[in-house]
Amino acid sequence: MTKERTFIAIKPDGVQRGYVSEILGRFEKKGFKLVGLKQLIPSKELAQNHYGVHRERPFFGDLVDFISSGPVVAMVWEGEGVILSARKLIGATKPLEAEPGTIRGDLAIDIGRNIIHGSDGEDTAKFEINLWFNEEELCEWETSDSKWRSEN
């Protein structure tokens, strides 16, 4: 496997409930490298672009309003298989269907307040990273323990 990048966002409910450090810790403990991090209150335009795939769905307006209602912690994580692994760490979209031990399984109850967003594939990850971050906001660096994280 080659190193890849994914976009992760802690939604306003996760920030307000104080889960930022716990979520960061789960990704770090898994062995992924944080290469982009910022906190912002997204504009309606950014939220609409991010969730554009849902534009025709009945919940789109409420979703945009929610995401732009408070601070979001936007992140880019890097590592081997990070997209699929992040999806497993996050858990099912519906928290009541998410396995215990996942972020949503442990911390969320309602689908409308499910704490976190993660890219669902390579193309989506590239789109979302480019939407939320400028290239100069991403940090290229090597961890001092990289040889202990993977054979590659």
Curated annotation (Swiss-Prot):
Assigned EC number: 2.7.4.6
Cofactor(s) needed for function: Mg(2+)
Entry keywords, A to Z: ATP-binding, Cytoplasm, Kinase, Magnesium, Metal-binding, Nucleotide metabolism, Nucleotide-binding, Phosphoprotein, Transferase
Subcellular location: Cytoplasm
GO cellular component, one term: cytoplasm
GO molecular function, one term: metal ion binding
Active-site residue numbers: H117
Enzymatic reactions: a 2'-deoxyribonucleoside 5'-diphosphate + ATP = a 2'-deoxyribonucleoside 5'-triphosphate + ADP; a ribonucleoside 5'-diphosphate + ATP = a ribonucleoside 5'-triphosphate + ADP
Enzyme superclass (EC): transferase
Domain of life the protein comes from: Bacteria
Family: Belongs to the NDK family.
Function: Major role in the synthesis of nucleoside triphosphates other than ATP. The ATP gamma phosphate is transferred to the NDP beta phosphate via a ping-pong mechanism, using a phosphorylated active-site intermediate.
PANTHER family assigned to the protein according to its UniProt record, in alphabetical order: NUCLEOSIDE DIPHOSPHATE KINASE
Assembly with partners or alone: Homotetramer.
Protein name as catalogued: Nucleoside diphosphate kinase
Organism expressing this protein natively: Prochlorococcus marinus (strain AS9601)
Lineage, broadest ranks: Bacteria, Bacillati, Cyanobacteriota, Cyanophyceae, Synechococcales
Gene from which the chain derives: ndk
